[in-house]
């Protein structure tokens, strides 16, 4: 039966295809992130082994060090092909020699070279076992000279009348340098089925007791309750028979079947061994990731009678608590501790968006079967599967505590995985990894599976530091990370004297005629470490006055080179306690620096001089990660502050603004009037700090007031804080009293609350009582807007009747209605503040007694103005004329020309363009008005919104009432509803204006028509008069031409002849 076969009568099917197949399916969830700081696993001199493509080479790994002279790496490749006849991807285990020099290649270990065994059924030979796709090499474990490898998907054909093919699993044991092999298949029997051991998958997990006995996990037995099986390797070898396929070992031990409530628990998913009862007999630890109602738990099992002693239960359902288990004495108290992985743990920071990050639980043993509450380490990367693999490393950095490697194989955006190294301490594990390994060498395949398999606690290169193997089965590679020797440095800085008197100038400055105060500086160091060289060279770097910022004046310099920085080698012999080097340091002249109070910090930074290391296979030493490589010491300048050399100032500060209110939109020039004084001892490097609010800008210091001190002030910015800093003296001596004025502009007030704050304080470099009281000035912000409305009628009056024009009683075109009348209204915000929500309403003289007065054709807006649609605009659906261009008068109005129609705020000011008495005023009190309602948007100071109403005087209405003068009045009003600020003014602007159009009558005129014959007669008479006049002028000789006298011509010719050229 295949793994997906239907379940028996005791519950639902829960197939288990090992983390092997699950891992292959989960490869789409890999993560990777950059490495953090590196500690002592070497990432440069890696030894990388490669296997056949697609073989999952690296799925399982282990060290094989049978004796002091031999070392190798064992690598499982569960999908590899072998030389076994007719077997496809049966899997293999590779032997990879160490060191991997020259052309040395990994080779398959011949655990099994045979085909499937067969039996005769009804005269035909049929296979009784199935080794293709059995995943041999999915687990590999070595103990001294013994090596065990398992195939958890090995299938067995039962001997029932109806045969079934069950994944019972099998293992092979190799001893004596792979010269002898034996098979161990504890779940293979003649009556295998899901209810029994048919789905056992023996070898799913694997470990050894310290005495060499074998521990095998079979999580599929008994309807996937799972079981754990132990046996002696010696018994397996001694009782093995290739032909007796169902032979049972006499000393074999197995956990028994449990009640049905334990189905689908997966006992044996992971196994380990440790001592927890206080005797010399190790116990068995087994992971059960789906037990306890899917919360998962780990059990400690008695190795003698296979009874359950104690459980650790998971905290979250489906977290797969127990996926991995590791036993290690992390805190080095002589008692074994238990680590449990739950790689599917979900972090529920927000219930709506949980993150699968994984967790590790460390149970520290206090005494026999008594453990502390677990220390929990939580992964940081979603779907990283933190805790999918764990490895006991031993004491990686030789600090006396064992360390742990944790695999995060599905980590990072590039899906390359990583391995985190956690160092142990007396309380458990450090909460942050000391090193993060990333699979750059395995980057050509995605996912690479880097970190899915780990193995440590073996020193393959014999340098007294344990090493680590990391498998990346997705890319078919395995890497050996070797631990680097750790060098611990004890460094010291010695200064003499530590208090420097500037007056005691005992050192002659080279290349100068000046003397200076000075002191001696001694740099000393010693080294310790396991397996380090006898001579260690440190590159030492000394920084003088190191707390001064970059670019600041260093108060001290080395006497021999006038520099504040020095790098030099420090050669240390391992046998000697300390080795030292001496220097002389001098102080600059006190006129060159201000700071006399802060300590002169001398810092020493050191590193290993890697140029002294030999090139070769050996890894280079590294400095201890947990020891700071920076040492500092401080010297002090002697100041005149009494016997204790300690100045205690008493700084006082007061301030007030010259105005207590600023207006939004205005320029808002503001001055802060400040008083600073010192009523104590000298304040060194005393400075006034004024924190500038984001709404304000610094203008400068007030210099026109003789009562103010003209201090030196400058604008500075630290991070995002803007400030003005004024120098008050160095020192600001006792009794100092300064007054000064600082000017600011406050232009940016639109997006702030209704006040701004200026924070002020005096600060000095004194150690005790260095600062003054803190002063905070609050200045209120208000909004003020002056709003006006103005308007015009064009034309201001209409004269009736219109010459040669008569209105139509039922007009169809606009021109047939009457004269054009336009009213234009402008809402203008003088400012300075902004208005954001205003209602503008117009009462329009529309009709009286069902007769139209001013008939509207069109409403036009300019600016942030939107009017509501009105059905009474052109209700007769008269065809409108093309809208004419604005007249010069209207254009001038739109350019904000001075118009006599002007109202501000609440005033109502009516101005008549023309008065003719007596004229009857038609307004909204005695006629029917059309209401036009408009919403005005945001108007900054100086901006306007314009409304233009185009209408026609309904001439028919007025021609029926000849000689009666009228004044048609429209009323426009506004009300500001809101300003765009958090707090609104107590009173918002409003106002109105009346615009009139006069209708007057012309004086009657009498018209005369001239007959045509009169016109013709007048023309003929005109022509006759012209002819008589012309004749008279001709008779008088007016048209005769006047000729010049003859003698004049003779004289002219004579003059011409006289002009003969000379010979």
Swiss-Prot record:
Question: What GO cellular component entries does it have?
Answer: apical part of cell; cell surface; dendritic spine membrane; endoplasmic reticulum; external side of plasma membrane; focal adhesion; glutamatergic synapse; integrin alpha8-beta1 complex
The protein's predominant localisation is membrane
Q: Where is this motif: Cell attachment site?
A: 455-457
Q: Which positions does UniProt annotate for Ca(2+) 2 binding?
A: 329, 331, 333, 335, 337
Annotated binding of Ca(2+) 3, by residue: 395, 397, 399, 401, 403
Q: Which residues lie on this side of the membrane: Extracellular?
A: 39-1012
Tissue specificity remark = Expressed in mesenchymal cells, including alveolar myofibroblasts, kidney mesangial cells and hepatic stellar cells and vascular and visceral smooth muscle (at protein level).
Q: Name one GO biological process term.
A: extracellular matrix organization
Task: Kindly identify the disorder that the protein's record connects it with.
Answer: Renal hypodysplasia/aplasia 1: A perinatally lethal renal disease encompassing a spectrum of kidney development defects, including renal agenesis, bilateral renal aplasia, hypoplasia, (cystic) dysplasia, and severe obstructive uropathy.
Recorded hits in SMART domains, A to Z, give:
Int_alpha
- Cytoplasmic topological segments: 1034-1063
Q: What is the effect of changing residue 255 to M?
A: In RHDA1; uncertain significance
- What would be an example GO MF term here? metal ion binding
Q: What is this protein called?
A: Integrin alpha-8
Which residues are involved in binding Ca(2+) 1? 275, 277, 279, 283
């Amino acid at each position: 039966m295949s793994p997906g076969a239907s379940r028996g009568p005791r519950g639902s099917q829960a197939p288990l295809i090992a983390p092997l197949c699950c891992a292959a399916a989960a490869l789409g969830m890999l993560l990777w992130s950059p490495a953090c700081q590196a500690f002592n696993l070497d990432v440069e001199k890696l030894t990388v082994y490669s296997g056949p493509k697609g073989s999952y080479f690296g799925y399982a790994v282990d060290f094989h060090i049978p004796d002091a002279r031999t070392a190798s790496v064992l690598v499982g490749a569960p999908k590899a092909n072998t030389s076994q006849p007719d077997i496809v991807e049966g899997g293999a285990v590779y032997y990879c020699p160490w060191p991997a020099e020259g052309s040395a290649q990994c080779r398959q270990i011949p655990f099994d070279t045979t085909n499937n065994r067969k039996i005769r059924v009804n005269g035909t030979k049929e296979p009784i076992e199935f080794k293709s796709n059995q995943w041999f090499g999915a687990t590999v474990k070595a103990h001294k000279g013994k090596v065990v490898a398992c195939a958890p998907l090995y299938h067995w054909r039962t001997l029932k009348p109806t045969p079934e093919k069950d994944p019972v699993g099998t293992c092979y044991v190799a001893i004596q340098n792979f010269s002898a092999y034996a098979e161990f298949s504890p779940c293979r029997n003649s009556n295998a089925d899901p209810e029994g051991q048919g789905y056992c998958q023996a070898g799913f997990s694997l470990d050894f007791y310290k005495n060499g006995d074998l521990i095998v996990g079979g999580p599929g037995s008994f309807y996937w309750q799972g079981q754990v099986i132990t046996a002696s390797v010696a018994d397996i070898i001694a009782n093995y028979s290739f032909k007796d396929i169902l032979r049972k070992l006499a000393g074999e031990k197995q956990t028994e079947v449990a009640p049905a409530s334990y189905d689908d628990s997966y006992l044996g998913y992971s196994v380990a061994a440790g001592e927890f009862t206080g005797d010399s007999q190790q116990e068995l630890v087994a992971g059960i990731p789906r037990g306890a109602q899917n919360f998962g738990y780990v059990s400690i099992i008695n190795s003698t009678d296979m009874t359950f002693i104690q459980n650790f239960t998971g905290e979250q359902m489906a977290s797969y608590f127990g996926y991995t288990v590791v036993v290690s004495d992390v805190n080095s108290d002589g008692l074994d501790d238990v680590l449990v992985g739950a790689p599917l743990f979900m972090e529920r920071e927000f219930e709506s968006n949980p993150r699968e990050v994984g967790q590790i639980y460390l149970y520290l043993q206090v005494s026999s079967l008594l453990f502390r509450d677990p220390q929990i380490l939580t992964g940081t990367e979603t779907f990283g599967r933190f805790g999918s693999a764990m490895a006991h490393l031993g004491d990686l950095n030789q600090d006396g505590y064992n360390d742990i490697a944790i695999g995060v194989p599905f980590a990072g955006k590039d899906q390359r995985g990583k391995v985190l190294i956690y160092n142990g301490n007396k309380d458990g594990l450090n909460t942050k990894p000391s090193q993060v390994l990333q699979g750059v060498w395995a980057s050509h395949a995605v996912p690479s599976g880097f970190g899915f398999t780990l193995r440590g606690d073996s020193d393959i290169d014999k340098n007294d530091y344990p090493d680590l193997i990391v498998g990346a089965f997705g890319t078919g590679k395995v890497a050996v990370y070797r631990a680097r020797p750790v060098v611990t440095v004890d460094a010291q800085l010695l200064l003499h004297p530590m208090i420097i008197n500037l007056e005691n100038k005992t050192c002659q400055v080279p290349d100068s005629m000046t003397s200076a105060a000075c002191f001696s500086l001694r740099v000393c160091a010693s080294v310790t470490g396991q397996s380090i060289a006898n001579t260690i060279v440190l590159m030492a770097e000394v920084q003088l006055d190191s707390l001064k910022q970059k670019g600041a004046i260093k108060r001290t310099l080395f006497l021999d080179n006038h520099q504040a920085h020095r790098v030099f080698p420090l050669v240390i012999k391992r046998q000697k306690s300390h080795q030292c080097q001496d220097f002389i340091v001098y102080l600059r002249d006190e006129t060159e620096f201000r700071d006399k109070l802060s300590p002169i910090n001398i810092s020493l930074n050191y590193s290993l001089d890697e140029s002294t290391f030999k090139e070769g296979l050996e890894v280079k030493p590294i400095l201890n990660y947990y020891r700071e490589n920076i040492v500092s010491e401080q010297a002090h300048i002697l100041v005149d502050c009494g016997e204790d050399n300690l100045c205690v100032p008493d700084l006082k500060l007061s301030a007030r603004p010259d105005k207590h209110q600023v207006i939004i939109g205005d320029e808002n020039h503001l001055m802060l009037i400040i008083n600073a004084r010192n009523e104590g001892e000298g304040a060194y490097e005393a400075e006034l700090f004024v924190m500038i609010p984001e709404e304000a800008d610094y203008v400068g210091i007030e210099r026109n007031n003789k009562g103010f001190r003209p201090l030196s002030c400058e604008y500075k910015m630290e991070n995002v804080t803007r400030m003005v800093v004024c120098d008050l003296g160095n020192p600001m001596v006792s009794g100092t009293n300064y007054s000064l004025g600082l000017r600011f502009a406050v232009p940016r007030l639109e997006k702030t609350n209704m006040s701004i704050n200026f924070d002020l304080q005096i600060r000095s470099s004194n150690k005790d009582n260095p600062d003054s009281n803190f002063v905070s000035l609050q200045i209120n912000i208000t909004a003020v807007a002056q709003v006006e409305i103005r308007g015009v009628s064009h034309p201001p009056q209409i004269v009736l009747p219109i010459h040669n024009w008569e209105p139509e009683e039922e007009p169809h075109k606009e021109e047939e209605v009457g004269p054009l009348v336009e009213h234009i209204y402008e809402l203008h915000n003088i400012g300075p503040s902004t208005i954001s929500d205003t209602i503008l309403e117009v009462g329009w003289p529309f009709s009286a007694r069902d007769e139209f007065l001013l008939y509207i054709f069109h409403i036009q807006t300019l600016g942030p103005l939107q009017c509501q649609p009105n059905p009474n605009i052109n209700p007769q659906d008269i065809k409108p004329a093309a809208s004419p261009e604005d007249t010069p008068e209207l254009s001038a109005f739109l350019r904000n020309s001075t118009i006599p129609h002007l109202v501000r705020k609440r005033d109502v000011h009516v101005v008549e363009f023309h008065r003719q008495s007596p004229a009857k005023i038609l307004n909204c009190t005695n006629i029917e008005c059309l209401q036009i309602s408009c919403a005005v948007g945001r108007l900054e100071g100086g901006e306007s919104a314009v409304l233009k109403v185009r209408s026609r005087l309904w001439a028919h209405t007025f021609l029926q009432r000849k000689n009666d003068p009228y004044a048609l009045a429209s009323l426009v009003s506004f009300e500001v509803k809101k300003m765009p600020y958090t707090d609104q003014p107590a009173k918002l602007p409003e106002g109105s204006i009346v615009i009139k159009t006069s209708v007057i009558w012309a004086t009657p005129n009498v018209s005369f028509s001239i007959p045509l014959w009169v016109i013709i007669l007048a023309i003929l008479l005109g022509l006759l008069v012209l002819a008589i006049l012309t004749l008279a002028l001709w008779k008088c000789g007016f048209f005769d031409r006047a000729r010049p006298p003859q003698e004049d011509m003779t004289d002219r010719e004579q003059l011409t002849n006289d002009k003969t050229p000379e010979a």
